[in-house]
């Protein structure tokens, strides 16, 4: 939205309009979903003024009111589904990972959480007819897990039919079996994966703001951002806030971070995929003692919760633990050199 239209809001003159744009509030919708405290801190306006601006933007953008269930259903038709390319898992998820939602994948070390994020960074770039969303990925890396070589493995692991179609769409000459051709295709895929390493929790929160800017800048491009991965969501928070005395502060920061991620998903029709670490509950005498980190804050904010569990050799059990519209259940996949594959 052009800057001069922001000046139609009460209390917004040329100077305030510039401040709002510099802080990332470039549209009525972006303003409407902000909080007065957030706008006051980032755009350097008074909290009372921020409240008036936000309320006016909500009226102008028709955000924040009631709507019928039929209208919600119609709006949900715009939501995309990112396929795992594993029929059993896709069926479990009702088609794949949803845009405008947070999907949490948790599990112990070596369960395959980072494998999922890498595979989705490949799959999201596939056209819809092949289960993708035809978009780019953002990868916030807090554990130094991103490996371009793994993207190469997974790209080469696609069916030749899909690779041939990708070569044609991206105007790359050659065949799926040619190394130079596949290297050119890999370079093309890596160009649409935006990676940033998070050095601590504050930096990770800042990267969420940068991800929002990146999604905004690319929303009208040939590859809009359709996937935001955070691997892992909780590693820095867990390391920096130790003991019960710091628990409240940790949860407050984590809550804000999650809502920042959720806002990106809502504003730019992006799927948000986060991985989470686990801990063992010593008080559990029956069943699996493995519990995800993050407490109720993360449990309530994640739209879909998935538990990855090791099985024999390369087999992994994928369990859907929580979803608003789907029954709990399990599926099986294998972690191969060529990527995530069906049983």
Curated annotation (Swiss-Prot):
Q: Which InterPro entries match?
A: AAA+_ATPase, DNA_recomb/repair_Rad51_C, DNA_recomb/repair_RadA, DNA_recomb/repair_RecA-like, DNA_repair_Rad51/TF_NusA_a-hlx, P-loop_NTPase, RecA_ATP-bd, RecA_monomer-monomer_interface
Per the record's keyword annotation, is Mitochondrion included, yes or no? no
One BP annotation, GO: DNA recombination
- Pfam families referenced in this protein's UniProt entry, alphabetically: HHH_5, Rad51
Q: What are the recorded GO MF terms, alphabetically?
A: ATP binding; ATP hydrolysis activity; ATP-dependent DNA damage sensor activity; damaged DNA binding
Q: Which UniProt keywords apply?
A: ATP-binding, DNA damage, DNA recombination, DNA-binding, Nucleotide-binding
Whether Transport counts among this entry's keywords is: no
Q: Which positions are annotated as binding ATP? A: 107-114
Family in the record:
Belongs to the eukaryotic RecA-like protein family.
Q: What is its biological role?
A: Involved in DNA repair and in homologous recombination. Binds and assemble on single-stranded DNA to form a nucleoprotein filament. Hydrolyzes ATP in a ssDNA-dependent manner and promotes DNA strand exchange between homologous DNA molecules.
Q: What is the name of the protein in this document?
A: DNA repair and recombination protein RadA
Provenance organism: Haloquadratum walsbyi (strain DSM 16790 / HBSQ001)
- What's the encoding gene here? radA
């Amino acid at each position: 939205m052009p800057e001069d239209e922001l000046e139609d809001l009460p209390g917004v003159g040329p100077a305030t309009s510039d401040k709002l744009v510099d802080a990332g509030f470039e549209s009525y919708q972006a303003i409407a979903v902000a909080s007065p405290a957030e706008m006051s801190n980032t755009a350097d306006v008074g909290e009372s003024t921020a409240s008036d601006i936000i309320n006016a933007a909500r009226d102008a953008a028709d955000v924040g009111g009631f709507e019928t269930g039929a209208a919600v259903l119609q709006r949900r038709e715009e939501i995309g589904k990112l396929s795992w390319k594993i029929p059993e898992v896709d069926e479990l998820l009702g088609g794949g990972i949803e845009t405008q939602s947070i999907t949490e994948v948790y599990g112990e070390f070596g369960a395959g959480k980072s494998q999922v994020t890498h595979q989705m960074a490949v799959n999201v770039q596939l056209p819809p007819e092949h289960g993708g969303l035809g978009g780019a990925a953002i990868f916030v890396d807090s554990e130094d897990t991103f490996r371009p070589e793994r993207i190469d493995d997974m790209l080469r692991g696609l069916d030749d039919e899909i690779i041939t179609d990708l070569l044609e769409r991206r105007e790359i000459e050659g065949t799926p079996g040619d190394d130079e051709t596949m290297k050119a295709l890999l370079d093309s895929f890596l160009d649409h994966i935006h990676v940033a390493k998070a050095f601590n929790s504050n930096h990770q929160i800042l990267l969420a703001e940068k991800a929002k800017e990146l999604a905004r800048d690319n929303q009208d491009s040939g590859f809009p951002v359709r996937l935001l991965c955070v691997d892992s969501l909780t590693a820095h928070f867990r390391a920096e806030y130790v003991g019960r005395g710091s628990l409240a502060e940790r949860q407050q920061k984590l809550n804000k971070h999650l809502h920042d991620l959720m806002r990106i998903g809502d504003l730019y029709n992006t799927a948000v995929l986060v991985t989470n670490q686990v801990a063992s509950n010593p008080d559990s005498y029956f069943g699996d003692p493995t519990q995800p980190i993050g407490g109720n804050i993360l449990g309530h904010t994640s739209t879909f919760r998935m538990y990855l569990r090791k099985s024999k050799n390369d087999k992994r059990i994928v369990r859907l633990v929580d979803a608003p519209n789907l029954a709990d259940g399990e599926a099986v996949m294998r972690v191969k050199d060529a990527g995530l594959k069906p049983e």
